[in-house]
Amino acid sequence: LMALIAETASFLIDGKLFPGCFALQYICNTVCTGFTVLVGYLWNLFLEFKIYRSMKRLKNKALILGFPLFAVACLMVVNLFGNGIFFDISDTNVYTRGGLTPILYVTVLIYFVESICAAHWAKYKGNSVKFFPVYYFVIPCLIGIVAQVMFYGISTGWASIAIGFVFVSLQLQTFNSFVDDISGLFNRKYFNFYMEKLCKTKRADIYGILLDVNNFKKINDDYGHYVGDGAIRNIGKILSESVPKNAVPMRMAEI
């Protein structure tokens, strides 16, 4: 929201002279330019945590991916001294791109490509990312950023990012409705959806294996539901890591 406001303000004051106009122009363009790279960085961290739910992995990923962001942040500070490496503000308060502007777009592209590779790698390793909205966010963002690069003077970058966030929100709602909260496996609602889809599109035979946990009620009675929930989570993790790529583990709960 801050970046959208800053970008709008930078377009409104561009070429207009008033007290403090140069400082305001520098601040607005620094915010909307620097935050573009920040979005790519935060998107990767969001993806990492959403897939693995591990703070240790998240901290390692944040450190590794933080180097390009830190380098850009340092250059943005240098740019504030008026050397125009990323952008320059003329004596008439007009914004122009600097010679190192492509570095910003390349950095964002690297972050987006990294998120796509991370999602595909997680899927290859057996994690449930069938509904994860990687492309729903990346594609609108890339379209908007590329359009803004090619057609100088239009503002589509942050508008496309906002659209990407809307797509992500809608897709995550669908994903959450199909996933069991405790086990992390797909639920019976997804089973019904999956079977209906297979009946319409797949001609090959479909097989299923139904497993039951022995004495699970006794675990809850003797040790409490907290321990029982932990057992369900462990079972879900074991099943997710054990099934082949063309199989889908689900939790049907009580039938």
Predicted feature descriptions by range:
Residues 1-6, 59-71, 95-149:
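Alpha-helical transmembrane segments of multi-pass integral membrane proteins
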Residues 1-45, 65-82, 134-149:
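Hydrophobic alpha-helical transmembrane segments of multi-pass membrane proteins
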Residues 16-19, 85-93:
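Membrane-interface helix termini and inter-helical loops of multi-pass transporters
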Residues 48-55, 86, 123-126, 151:
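Membrane-interfacial segments
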